[in-house]
């Protein structure tokens, strides 16, 4: 299918052209492009968009307990079966009292968290007070909703402490927003939920909560090929957020599953077998 220019004839002289024939000669020199050979162009766009989607994976989690909010994440970035990085920072500091997590497209998550941080700072300057966790999550949800259906890939948690205490919200790229006491997002979330749900108690100490978060991330990286690297754990309390630990999941494996030393009988049996 070629672009038809037969309807461009006109009796009015055009600025920059001596006559209508000059304009047609100029148009005829412009290269023509084939149009998509499909009757349903909307369907064609959808198929083309699906072809551009890459498999992604991660594990992030957050939960509320009596001491505040515990946030943890792995650090692996992947595209399908290719591991592009083992040191991605998936917990973003929005302000000294609020954190955001990354799951989905790295560029989308980083951009919208930076954007949210700017808007939270402007709110603080204009109103002489910090924005609430609820307000920040609603602001992010509204921004993402305005780009709904345009190919964004964002699954984030907004965790923080404000005048009402700890707050935790989940926000996705469709503008959805959920409030809860514990969430896990990413391809490794089913494995993290298995550990998190079985060990969660509201009245945990900070040490117990950090250990639960670390163990949940480790087990997710052990079973999910798209998660790995370093398990980072943050705590958000009345004084703001603090990074508690960042442990290589390979070393955590031997912490949770120590290798039992061989007994003398086993050593003798192996030597005899050789």
From Swiss-Prot:
Function, in words: The proteasome is a multicatalytic proteinase complex which is characterized by its ability to cleave peptides with Arg, Phe, Tyr, Leu, and Glu adjacent to the leaving group at neutral or slightly basic pH. The proteasome has an ATP-dependent proteolytic activity.
Record keyword Nucleus present: yes
A Pfam family per the record: Proteasome
Enzyme class: hydrolase
CDD domains: proteasome_beta_type_5
Native source species: Arabidopsis thaliana (Mouse-ear cress)
GO molecular function terms attached to this record: threonine-type endopeptidase activity
Localization per record: Cytoplasm; Nucleus
GO cellular component, one term: cytoplasm
Keywords: Cytoplasm, Hydrolase, Nucleus, Protease, Proteasome, Threonine protease, Zymogen
Name by which UniProt lists this protein: Proteasome subunit beta type-5-A
E.C. code: 3.4.25.1
Record bears the keyword Cytoplasm: yes
Propeptide: 1-57
Xref: InterPro entries: Ntn_hydrolases_N (IPR029055), Pept_T1A_subB (IPR000243), Proteasome_bsu_CS (IPR016050), Proteasome_sua/b (IPR001353), Proteasome_suB-type (IPR023333)
């Amino acid at each position: 299918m070629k672009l038809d220019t037969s309807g461009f004839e006109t009796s009015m002289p055009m600025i920059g052209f001596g006559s209508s024939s000059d304009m047609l000669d100029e148009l005829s020199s412009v290269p023509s492009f084939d149009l998509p050979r499909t009757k349903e162009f909307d369907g064609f766009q959808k198929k083309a968009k699906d072809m551009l989607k890459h498999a992604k994976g991660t594990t992030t989690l957050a939960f509320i307990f009596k001491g505040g909010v515990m946030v943890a994440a792995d650090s692996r970035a992947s595209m399908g079966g290719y591991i592009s990085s083992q040191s991605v920072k998936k917990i973003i500091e929005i302000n000294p009292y609020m954190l955001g997590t990354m799951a989905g497209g790295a560029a989308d998550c980083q951009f919208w968290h930076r954007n949210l941080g700017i808007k939270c700072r402007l709110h603080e300057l204009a109103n002489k007070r910090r924005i609430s966790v609820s307000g920040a999550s609603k602001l992010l949800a509204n921004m993402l909703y305005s780009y709904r259906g345009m190919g964004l890939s964002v699954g984030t948690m907004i965790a923080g402490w404000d005048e009402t205490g700890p707050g935790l919200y989940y926000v996705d790229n469709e503008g959805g927003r959920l409030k809860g006491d514990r969430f896990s997002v990413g391809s490794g979330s089913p494995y993290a939920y298995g550990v998190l749900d079985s060990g969660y108690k509201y009245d945990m100490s900070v040490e117990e909560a950090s250990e639960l978060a670390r163990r949940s991330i480790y087990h997710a990286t052990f079973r999910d090929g798209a998660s790995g690297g370093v398990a980072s754990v943050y705590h958000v309390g009345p004084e703001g957020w603090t990074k508690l630990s960042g442990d290589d999941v390979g070393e955590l494996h031997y912490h949770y599953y120590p290798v039992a030393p061989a007994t003398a009988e086993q050593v003798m049996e192996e030597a005899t077998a050789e």
